[in-house]
């Protein structure tokens, strides 16, 4: 079971989602579903409006419908708390597709982290999308130069039900900051951005694709956005205690950067229910995911590559449809 500290950190919504997941784990829920369980009416879980998942989910929903010939196919992008919520709702049949961080998906299938004691057995990997960097966002006028400077500050750490929340706590902990050392705002960057602008938040820790349009919007409004680096022994601690990889945000990512910013990253990936999405439809979804990526309007489309489609799969089973597509592409042994 989750510790009381973890439960408080997750909030009621995420805890309720995990309780529902527990009901979906165990014998009979893994593997593929029967034909009567498959559907072409798909709900795609995304994230908050301030991140990349939401617009990407909207655009992919349109691409799926426009490029896949399947009777009755309808795909609707749904705003959610992101990774944890998306995987939990796939487990209980409320979503059929979802975008999530690869490290959160590993936890889901292994019953670890946010999913302690609640293994998800009906989620299949459709493929890696793009890297997501941890971005510790503040304003130049804040005087914040290091994560350690966030002691006593008001920090947005992401909404309950998202992988950002757990990542933010890991980052803060590596710098010696635990619950009570800062005031936590449980919201996504869409809301946190406004609070940074009006002075009701000192910083926001986000896991976002680079470049993040919402961060560029904040710079356009304030003219003083600053990214706080993760480096030194603290960076080593974060990497050693998580599935994050060292990453460097290039200086040309944002106009306000003068030099690269060291940080960590995970991978955003698309997942599908193995109970409700058939092999045939899963194949078409995976094919569209990569062969229509150039049709996206988001900058992250440049990072979506079929050659790297299986990166970050880890312990998550391939969806049968994705396996078929990847075999055709020569990606599997």
Which residues does each predicted region cover?
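An extracytoplasmic/periplasmic, membrane-proximal ligand-sensing/linker region
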Residues: 187, 191, 208-229, 234-240, ...
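Bilobed "Venus flytrap"/periplasmic-binding protein-like clamshell domains
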Residues: 41-67, 131-198, 308, 312, ...
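Pocket-lining segment of extracytoplasmic ligand-binding domains
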Residues: 102-104, 111-114, 142, 179-271
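Pocket-flanking alpha-helical
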Residues: 62-63, 76-117, 136, 190-197, ...
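Bacterial N-terminal signal peptides that target proteins for export
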Residues: 1-13
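C-terminal motif of bacterial Sec signal peptides marking the signal peptidase cleavage site
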Residues: 20-23
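Bacterial signal peptide processing site
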Residues: 25-28
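A bilobed periplasmic-binding-protein/Venus flytrap-type ligand-binding module shared by bacterial periplasmic
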Residues: 131-144, 242, 266-280
